[in-house]
């Protein structure tokens, strides 16, 4: 499967690190992954170190319509089987919009359980065929704003334990 991941965060924090783990695991299982992210961002460097192809596109946030246009063009050009949107900073709203315009199915990962306005959640998640919640608390928050249970799947975050697997002393 050919998967285009969209992560617009600039730092390599928890969420973007999860994206790197996911892409590495998918590539190891024979899938083709490409990442769209801001140039020079933390995830840009981490993905390249893992040998993951990267397309650098700057995104200024949820209302950066030129980003949505550039992303739509790249989706049409690269022809992925699915688009996986990750962060909130434009990747979800604009990534879903771009995938819709390119007529490619999209999923989104949600990592936080903060409350959203029902009407905004309906707009935000409408383009996605599925929403990945990282915990039952996140899934519950989605249900509480009216997202259909059939659209939500819970997949917990990963941890690379190798850096912590050292003898004490």
What are the roles of these predicted feature ranges?
Residues 32-34, 54, 106, 149-152:
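Hydrophobic anchor at the start of a short beta-strand
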Residues 66, 140-144, 149-151, 158-169:
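Acidic anion/phosphate-binding donor-loop and adjacent secondary structure
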Residues 38, 48-53, 58-83, 93, ...:
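An amphipathic, basic-hydrophobic alpha-helix
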Residues 42-43, 90-91, 137-139:
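Alpha-helix capping/helix-boundary segments
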Residues 5-66:
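N-terminal strand-loop element at the rim of the active site
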Residues 100, 105-136, 140, 145-147:
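A conserved, positively charged/aromatic
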Residues 85-92, 110-113:
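Short His-centered aromatic/hydrophobic patch
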């Amino acid at each position: 499967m050919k998967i285009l991941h969209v992560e617009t965060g600039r730092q390599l924090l928890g969420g973007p690190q999860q994206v790197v783990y996911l892409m590495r695991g998918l590539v190891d299982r024979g899938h083709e992954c490409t990442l769209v992210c801001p140039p020079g961002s933390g995830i840009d460097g981490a993905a390249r170190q893992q040998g993951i192809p990267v397309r650098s596109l700057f995104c200024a946030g949820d209302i950066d319509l030129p980003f949505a246009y550039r992303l739509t063009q790249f989706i049409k050009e690269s022809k992925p089987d699915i688009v996986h949107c990750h962060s909130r900073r434009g990747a979800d709203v604009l990534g879903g919009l771009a995938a819709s315009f390119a007529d490619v199915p999209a999923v989104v990962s949600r990592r936080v359980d903060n409350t959203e306005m029902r009407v905004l959640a309906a707009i935000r998640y409408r383009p996605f065929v599925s929403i990945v919640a990282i915990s039952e608390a996140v899934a519950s928050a989605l249900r509480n704003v009216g997202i259909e249970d059939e659209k939500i799947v819970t997949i917990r975050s990963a941890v690379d334990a190798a850096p912590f697997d050292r003898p004490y002393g």
